[in-house]
Amino acid sequence: MEFIPTQTFYNRRYQPRPWTPRPTIQVIRPRPRPQRQAGQLAQLISAVNKLTMRAVPQQKPRKNRKNKKQKQKQQAPQNNTNQKKQPPKKKPAQKKKKPGRRERMCMKIENDCIFEVKHEGKVTGYACLVGDKVMKPAHVKGTIDNADLAKLAFKRSSKYDLECAQIPVHMKSDASKFTHEKPEGYYNWHHGAVQYSGGRFTIPTGAGKPGDSGRPIFDNKGRVVAIVLGGANEGARTALSVVTWNKDIVTKITPEGAEEWSLAIPVMCLLANTTFPCSQPPCIPCCYEKEPEETLRMLEDNVMRPGYYQLLQASLTCSPHRQRRSTKDNFNVYKATRPYLAHCPDCGEGHSCHSPVALERIRNEATDGTLKIQVSLQIGIGTDDSHDWTKLRYMDNHIPADAGRAGLFVRTSAPCTITGTMGHFILARCPKGETLTVGFTDSRKISHSCTHPFHHDPPVIGREKFHSRPQHGKELPCSTYVQSNAATAEEIEVHMPPDTPDRTLLSQQSGNVKITVNSQTVRYKCNCGGSNEGLITTDKVINNCKVDQCHAAVTNHKKWQYNSPLVPRNAELGDRKGKIHIPFPLANVTCMVPKARNPTVTYGKNQVIMLLYPDHPTLLSYRSMGEEPNYQEEWVTHKKEVVLTVPTEGLEVTWGNNEPYKYWPQLSANGTAHGHPHEIILYYYELYPTMTVVVVSVASFILLSMVGMAVGMCMCARRRCITPYELTPGATVPFLLSLICCIRTAKAATYQEAAVYLWNEQQPLFWLQALIPLAALIVLCNCLRLLPCCCKTLAFLSRNEHRCPHCERVRTRNSDPEHGGSTV
């Protein structure tokens, strides 16, 4: 909330008028008309006085256009006779366009509420008084051009790119109001109208420029709506980067490609205790082509300054006119450098040497397997310092020589593919190997090479070992060296090369020593009775001396060379050095990788059978989705059948670069949860055996206990009911009581007596007694028929507590465990 101003005061200029009651309507009587003739006479007298008292303006004589045309025709033949042509007349300077209504309104408000921010006397931006706060863009360097505001302690917010502080009390009347209401339409700022639409502020391209950072945007009531930070060119219009307010919330609107609009502060460099803008070096030395050695000295003196690369670019571009940018500009820095000879451990014949193609550094940080190799020769530059893609230059003794780029090669265990070259750097894709060799063939068909021990094993992108990028597949994040020769943040150090001894420059001629320079600068020193040394560019003869008494070395301080640890330094120059940018930056990109063919899947009991068809070595991995993943993986190179067990928690299988496959077991059992009691017990027993046995046992115990109690109570009641009748001799029990208590109403005869009685009295009933065994047989058969059902119901008592091996089935449906599927 510190960056939200509050309106604790009111500005007089933009306050609405106070409300007043409407005046009552009064009837005004018409005035009496004056006499018409008197009024006309007074008007006539005043008009005559004006005409007589006003001075008559002097009329300029009217020019005769015809005479003017005739004079021009007469002068035309006279001008043709003159041999010298008159220079064309300069066009009169166009008058500055007057500011419009919106500009005038903003300027009137800005006179009090904005202040310039200056750095070393130059305006870099503005600070604005809004509400009760002073707001200034954080990227604008300098101090506010006001003694009171410059003393304030500002709070900085990098999120909103803003700095703010409380306004001094005596300046609150100069501040502007602010508002968070922003209906779509047109607003005002210093350069005219600002359109607000779709949550963006836009202006016509060219209306804003660097130096406008911090200017406010006003609505038609003079309230601040936003503060400008920068802009992004979008063709006909420019989108503004602003800080605004949305109901007590600070919001920063930054369009894509927005640039800060603070005025650029020139970076200063040093030359002979004199400072100058790095982008505008002084005339001596001002150009590398005119004063190469002095220019390199100036660059070495400013190598640690922030504007070094501006000075380098300005020194190498001698033309004062603006030049069109091209790819050749990136090679321009190499005209101040040269290739060199460096030590190589293996020059191709099993011995070391000073090779023109020595390996300095091999980088393999890219995850796509690309190598970035730095060598001592330079590719893409000719010996005349011109850019040529088809050439490379190398150091042949002391002189750079040209060779064709087509003869350049890189190899490990097999030849590599060169994907990019520039300067000292080569990009290559190489197969697996233990050594790296770089070489070339010169114009004399002589091969030069250098071999270094280097273990190279290209990393695998994704989960498949493919050999070439597919046209279709899957994109995975990776890193590579971008094939761009533009300047990057990486840099290498360069220095003046040391003097190179060369004994071939000395020759003996009848007691004298002749030094042949061969168009070079040679430093010599001879000890022939006295000290004889110097620096020469032409041939020289040393009298009365021998070759063994002289030393000659080629010196060249007009070019830099790479600061290699394999080359000795120039002891006279100490630690003086320069810097140049290098190409091919490492960047995060996406790589296209293939996707393996989907496997053929067969579902079984608690398992999945997968038939795999790899086109190249493909990784198969699987894990459990429980607490213990038990991760397993293997590379599959040929057709293979894999059987995987599906645990209860689920199984995740990943084949190649495809999305993971997920499987879950489907629980099922015999019986049904909504059937007969024995089916219900069987269903739950197979799913939850322990709990089912406990529940059935407790229920059976309770049921048997209740049945036993009921039988006991019935027996007690029966005994109480029949006891009185048993104690009474010859008592007759009532029929209802005998029916309930299952007792005879009276003492009955024995079976023999009853049978005699039936035989004598009711013979049909006597013979019906023979059907009793038949009825018993029928009842027994029915009981035997229902016995299997009873046994199946009670079978759970003899089963183990583990689940049925057939109770689990596997199902899958779009890797969704909640989605239903048919049991397999």
Swiss-Prot record:
Disulfide pairs here are: 113-128
Residue ranges of the region described as Ribosome-binding: 91-100, 99-113
Q: Where is the composition biased (Low complexity)?
A: 22-44, 73-85
GO cellular component terms listed in the entry, alphabetical order? host cell cytoplasm; host cell nucleus; host cell plasma membrane; membrane; T=4 icosahedral viral capsid; virion membrane
Report residue spans for region: Transient transmembrane before p62-6K protein processing. 721-741
Q: Which Pfam families match?
A: Alpha_E1_glycop (PF01589), Alpha_E2_glycop (PF00943), Alpha_E3_glycop (PF01563), Peptidase_S3 (PF00944)
Q: Can the keyword Cell division be found in this entry's annotation?
A: no
Q: Origin, by domain of life?
A: Viruses
The segments annotated as topological domain Cytoplasmic are 714-748, 785-795
User: Annotated motif Nuclear export signal: location in the chain?
Assistant: 144-154
Q: Annotated region Functions as an uncleaved signal peptide for the precursor of protein E3/E2: where?
A: 262-274
Dimerization of the capsid protein: region residues: 183-193, 219-223
Top-level EC class, please?
hydrolase
Region (Disordered) residue spans: 1-104
Q: Which residues lie on this side of the membrane: Extracellular?
A: 262-692, 749-763
Positions of transmembrane segments: 693-713, 764-784
Does the record carry Glycoprotein as a key word?
yes
Site positions (Cleavage) are 261-262, 325-326, 748-749, 809-810
- What GO terms describe the biological role, i.e. biological process, of this protein? fusion of virus membrane with host endosome membrane; proteolysis; symbiont entry into host cell; symbiont-mediated suppression of host toll-like receptor signaling pathway; viral translational frameshifting; virion attachment to host cell
Name the record gives this protein: Frameshifted structural polyprotein
